């Protein structure tokens, strides 16, 4: 039996039902050039905790960080053999919830930093703002409104 033209052009592959589904997201990797500078930013500016660090079999230096109240980890990877990291603007970002954008803004000011964009208030009392992390990655900070995110 021949396939119809629509079946041949279908951009969504049909894999069938998985035998075993994933359980949860464990970590997301971000490659960086200056591992220590980036680790210090995430720890001192955002308050993340270093969970572990090691060297991979391929020679990458890896540091795993955890945000308060989260299970998922951020894996920072420095792999000099791969060449310098060049992050495309507006391609990727991490988003973190904060209690208060105003309070976090004061924290930034105390560190000699500032928001790169925002804060922008929403009608429900929440808002968003952005800061630039080392290596060109963007960090979105979200203050939940009365209705939630």
Residue locations for each model-derived region?
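Core segments of cupin and vicinal oxygen chelate
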Residues: 29-71
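Short, charged/polar, Gly/Pro-enriched secondary-structure boundary elements
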Residues: 70-74, 136-139
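Vicinal oxygen chelate
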Residues: 4-21, 24-34, 53-54, 63-68, 83-149
């Amino acid at each position: 039996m021949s396939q119809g033209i629509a079946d041949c052009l279908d951009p969504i592959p049909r894999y069938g039902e998985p035998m075993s589904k994933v359980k949860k997201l464990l970590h997301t990797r971000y490659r960086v050039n200056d591992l220590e500078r980036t680790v210090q930013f995430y720890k001192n500016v955002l308050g993340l905790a270093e969970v572990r660090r090691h060297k991979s079999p391929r020679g990458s230096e890896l540091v795993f960080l955890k945000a308060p109240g989260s299970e998922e980890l951020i894996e920072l990877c420095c792999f000099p053999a791969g060449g310098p990291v060049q992050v495309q603007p507006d391609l990727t970002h991490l988003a973190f919830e904060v209690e208060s954008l105003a309070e976090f803004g004061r924290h930034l000011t105390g560190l000699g930093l500032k928001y790169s964009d925002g804060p922008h208030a929403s009608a429900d009392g929440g808002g968003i703002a952005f800061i630039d992390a080392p290596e060109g990655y963007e960090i979105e900070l979200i203050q939940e409104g009365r209705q939630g995110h």
